[in-house]
């Protein structure tokens, strides 16, 4: 079964690479690990992505760590803001590390007993870029004291 899972994962990985090639994106392949890294310039902050094809769990995970940490005195507000945003999202979520202040965007799709299309990968990348670009500057503004948690909530209600 493990060999079959790896073959299925390798197919998903190759489809993902083809999808990125077809939209003309530059990326770094890590074929042995079934991982891809790439970056995108957003409206305000750069976004770095790691896509992992997990053969054992039959998942594709798209991850993007925001390029700043919430300051220690803003961590509780960061947790509240993350909950507010996650409530609004249909696909993907922001994971928040209260201890470290890190915010990580994650979008996952299963390929167990199914095939993932190039269109799905385009969607995953597109929705991730849009979502991160929409909220990363708001999280940063909250961290920098440019907006209050009340203003953050009002803007996203």
PLM regions: where:
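Ser/Thr-rich, low-complexity intrinsically disordered terminal regions
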Residues: 23-47, 53-60, 67
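Beta-strand/loop substructures that line and gate deep hydrophobic ligand-binding cavities in soluble
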Residues: 95, 101-114
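Short, surface-exposed coil-to-beta transition loops
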Residues: 45-48, 89-91
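A generic structural motif
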Residues: 66-70, 109-116
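Amphipathic alpha-helical segments
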Residues: 6-27
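Short, highly charged C-terminal tails/helix-capping segments
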Residues: 140-157
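Short, internal acidic amphipathic alpha-helical interface segments
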Residues: 65-102
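Long, contiguous binding/interaction regions
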Residues: 115, 122-133, 141
């Amino acid at each position: 079964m493990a060999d079959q899972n790896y073959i299925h994962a390798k197919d998903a990985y190759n489809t993902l690479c083809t999808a990125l090639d077809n939209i003309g994106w530059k990326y770094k392949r890590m074929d042995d690990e079934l991982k891809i890294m790439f970056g995108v310039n957003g409206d305000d902050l750069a976004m770095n992505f790691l896509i992992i094809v997990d053969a054992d769990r039959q998942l594709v995970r798209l991850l993007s760590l925001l390029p700043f940490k919430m300051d220690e005195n803003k961590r509780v507000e960061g947790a509240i803001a993350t909950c507010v945003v996650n409530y609004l999202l249909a696909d993907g979520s922001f994971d928040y590390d209260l201890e470290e202040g890190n915010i990580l965007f994650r979008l996952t799709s299963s390929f167990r007993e199914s095939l993932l299309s190039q269109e799905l990968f385009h969607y995953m990348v597109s929705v991730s870029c849009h979502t991160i670009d929409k909220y990363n500057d708001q999280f940063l503004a909250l961290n920098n004291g440019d907006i209050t948690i009340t203003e953050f909530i009002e803007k996203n209600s």
